[in-house]
């Protein structure tokens, strides 16, 4: 019998496999139950291991999972790459709804001939039921960006002004939304901006902008940073 007990541990753990895809129903391989403050997963079928063999077994498969795809550009961290991310909720309504231990999530999508094709994978941490799951699947092929610093001024004692322009290019035949993520620093304050933005934390802002098909979109902003002297 094969059992997996998952708990948060202070030492490195093994990674386990999950699959998220579109298509028909998936056969159930593991049953799950609570065990003290942990979760016990039991393999519902037999499996054979040869001498010194290592085998990967998919712990959980879910099909037709509704996901939201995001294109994210962070020029300071990733150069010209626009990252492709997926997010979904680990709920029964989404075809999931079970505690997920730390592991690898592989994503598949049907092609025009209804064959499942592997589109990417990412690691996830321990995920509770109804938590949101975010996956980074790679970089967009037809979308890119460039981040340019257009101004850097010491405006006054302890006051610095920096301006940036972000140029997004879309070679797709359809328009798309791109999230521009910027870090303005702990003491930064945005004083000018070309497009509305959301302040995600004390140091991070995000612009959500539309980039036309076969076109480009420019985003600019100015941030003032004050240094406090003792």
Which residues are covered by each model-predicted region?
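Long, intrinsically disordered, low-complexity accessory segments associated with secretion
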Residues: 1-230
């Amino acid at each position: 019998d094969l059992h997996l007990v998952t708990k948060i541990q202070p030492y490195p753990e093994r990674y386990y496999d999950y699959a998220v895809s579109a298509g028909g129903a998936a056969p159930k391989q593991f049953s799950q139950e609570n065990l003290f403050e942990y979760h016990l997963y039991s393999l519902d079928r037999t499996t054979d291991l040869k001498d010194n063999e290592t085998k990967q077994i998919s712990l959980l498969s879910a099909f037709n999972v509704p996901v939201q795809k995001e294109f994210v550009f962070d020029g300071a961290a990733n150069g010209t790459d626009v990252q492709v991310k997926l997010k979904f909720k680990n709920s029964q309504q989404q075809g999931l709804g079970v505690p997920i231990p730390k592991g690898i999530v592989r994503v598949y999508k049907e092609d025009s001939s209804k064959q499942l094709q592997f589109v990417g994978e990412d690691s996830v941490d321990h995920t509770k039921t109804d938590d949101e799951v975010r996956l980074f699947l790679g970089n967009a092929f037809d979308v890119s960006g460039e981040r340019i610093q257009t101004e850097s001024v010491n405006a006054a004692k302890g006051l610095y002004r920096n301006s940036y322009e972000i140029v997004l290019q879309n070679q797709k035949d359809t328009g798309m939304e791109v999230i521009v993520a910027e870090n303005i620093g702990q003491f930064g304050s945005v004083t000018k901006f070309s497009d509305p933005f959301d302040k995600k934390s004390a140091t991070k802002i995000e612009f959500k902008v539309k980039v036309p098909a076969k076109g480009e979109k420019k985003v600019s902003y100015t941030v003032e940073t004050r240094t406090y002297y003792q």
